[in-house]
Curated annotation (Swiss-Prot):
It comes from Shewanella piezotolerans (strain WP3 / JCM 13877). This is tRNA (guanine-N(1)-)-methyltransferase. Homodimer. It is found in: Cytoplasm. Its main location: cytoplasm. GO terms for molecular function: tRNA (guanine(37)-N1)-methyltransferase activity. It is an enzyme of class 2 (transferase). Keywords: Cytoplasm, Methyltransferase, S-adenosyl-L-methionine, Transferase, tRNA processing.
Length: 248
């Protein structure tokens, strides 16, 4: 997958290219990323990229010309099929379903705003989609862009050691992930559930599914409203609810 990022702070993206899962993906050639700084496309000695908004109001806006030219440069490198995404609080909220949709793209150009945002004409003429990572305020689009890159790259074939790693992540099937344990078997009076030590793969599968369903019910019940549960899932969830009532 090819990713282009338009940002005033390209150095921030070393966190993506140099570390962790995404860093390994870059080193293996599974993920390619380039950055474009709008300041490099200015025509004045001060490299001005922002100006006051028409109509007044607080803060500054990113100007059209430097940002537009940076986007054009990124698109030229990406090819005609590239989708231009602006990270914005007004955008579609990023979910695992959205991540899976974006992962089908061979190339993406991510535009990171700063200050009070960008001139609306950039969105009208250059942006294909707007995406948001949540209903809260950040200082710029860089952190949302890195979040999107990390989540999408996990679905690129070969990035994770095992396909099952991505399939078992929270939200991959619409549910939260189940609890996980590693050594030691006992710590401070807390023991690993016996079923995980049993070696019975079917029992382990059902336990994990039940825990995933139960955790979703307790922590994010709204997620269950959008799911059509199978007969097995309904049974496991009912058993989980009964066990909670008995322990109460």
């Amino acid at each position: 997958m090819w990713l282009g990022v338009v940002t005033l702070f390209p150095e921030m993206f070393r966190a993506v290219t140099d570390f962790g899962v995404t860093g390994r993906a870059v080193s293996k050639g599974l993920l390619e990323m380039q950055t474009w700084n709008p300041r490099d496309f200015t025509h004045d000695k001060h490299k001005t990229v922002d100006d006051r908004p028409y109509g007044g109001g607080p803060g500054m806006l990113m100007m059209v010309q430097p940002l537009r030219d940076a986007i054009h440069a990124a698109k030229a490198a990406a090819g005609k099929e590239a989708k231009v995404i602006y990270l914005s609080p007004q955008g579609r909220k990023l979910t695992q379903q959205g991540v899976e949709e974006l992962a089908k793209s061979s190339s993406l150009v991510l535009v990171c705003g700063r200050y009070e945002g960008v001139d609306e004409r950039i969105i009208q003429t250059e942006v294909d989609e707007e995406w948001s990572i949540g209903d809260y305020v950040l200082s710029g689009g860089e952190l949302p862009a890195m979040t999107l890159i990390d989540s999408v790259s996990r679905l690129v074939p070969g990035v994770l050691g095992k396909k099952a790693s991505a399939e078992q992540d929270s939200f991959s099937d619409g549910l939260l992930d189940c609890p996980h344990y590693t050594r030691p078997e006992s710590m401070d009076g807390l023991d690993v559930p016996a079923v995980l030590l049993s070696g019975n793969h079917e029992h382990i599968r059902r336990w994990r599914l039940q825990q995933s369903l139960g955790r979703t019910l307790l922590r994010r019940p709204e997620l269950l409203e959008n799911l059509a549960l199978t007969g097995e899932q309904e049974q496991l969830l009912a058993e989980f609810v009964d066990s909670i009532k008995q322990d109460a």
